[in-house]
């Protein structure tokens, strides 16, 4: 049979028939058995219980009540603003919109049940003990995946997927928000455009294709990026980067105490921070590793060979020892340390937007190379950031020093000081501010 109640503060039992309630208040409840179907337009009360083989539908759920779905039953909440949809024992539950939730409940999925949220703006989806849960479009809230649970988010625009304790999570496309993996959890992001995957505490995280965003690996976590085409993988104390493929546009940042295992370099940049071993005698560029190496904050590389197409960045606090430059580029920032260098072609570029002092310690052997001190940001009118370079000992011949000058103003210029030099011929090329501003220079200038 069919029964309908407009407003109810009591109990409705449905067995094999169809029952509906317009508004359910107070301690009221709807109980559905024996293949029955129950419908509630607005639930402001206790619960709707959907038993084996039955169907329950709630249009709007406003309170801390519960839709309980079990034993192969099917339940739907069109809009859930408060309360809980609880699915267990093989049941199937769907929330069309989880919106402005008060934080108490959301959707709970376990014991081989299946839960789906089509649009998630707030609240929680909690899955564990063999449950499987999906969010089609997440713009807020949290999907929590625990012991033996499986969670999936098709598109993550904001919010969080939190995986731990043996749970497994997947985000198909992440544009923002976060996936947090710990305590033996396993998480995968198919395409990472933005946001963060954080892996720690024995968790395992994989990004199939990274175009932007960040993967942060620490504290016994293991992280892999199958194609790092953009964005940054950060590996810090206790974390391990495993089998990552670094391509052009991507960056791997390795901090002290972090580990990298079996990385493949196909381009991009790797920055090492406060690491003094493990990066000696690398070949960058043609015939070697196609990657730009950046050295900062107490990190050191020794015996590096930089061929055509290779590049090394010596940033503040970084050290390069006994480097051989054969057609590639070394870029040095103020505060970087270079000692013992051989240049056969190639370029050394000094970069500091505020000017600064640079030193090349030991012997610089430079043949047919370029040392560029110019401020690349200045094309006219503005005053360059003038720099000074001190070389302990200069050897070789045919190298060109390119300097910023101001011959008309005679106010300042780049300066090169050579303490000792072997016999050889080198050249000075100037980028003069007066010339850039079309000011005629006449007479003697020093």
Give the positions of each predicted feature.
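Acidic, glycine-rich low-complexity segments
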Residues: 7-9, 15-16, 23, 34, ...
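Extracellular parallel beta-helix/beta-solenoid repeat domains
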Residues: 36, 73, 91, 113, ...
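N-linked glycosylation sites
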Residues: 62, 204, 259-262, 274, ...
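Low-complexity/repetitive intrinsically disordered segments
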Residues: 1-7
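Short, well-ordered turn and helix-capping elements at secondary-structure junctions
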Residues: 131, 185, 203, 221, ...
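Intrinsic low-complexity/IDR segments
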Residues: 271, 279-281, 388-389
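Fold-core signature of tandem repeat domains
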Residues: 5, 12-14, 21-24, 30-32, ...
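Extracellular beta-strand/loop-rich repeat segments of large surface/secreted proteins
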Residues: 293, 304, 312-313, 321-445
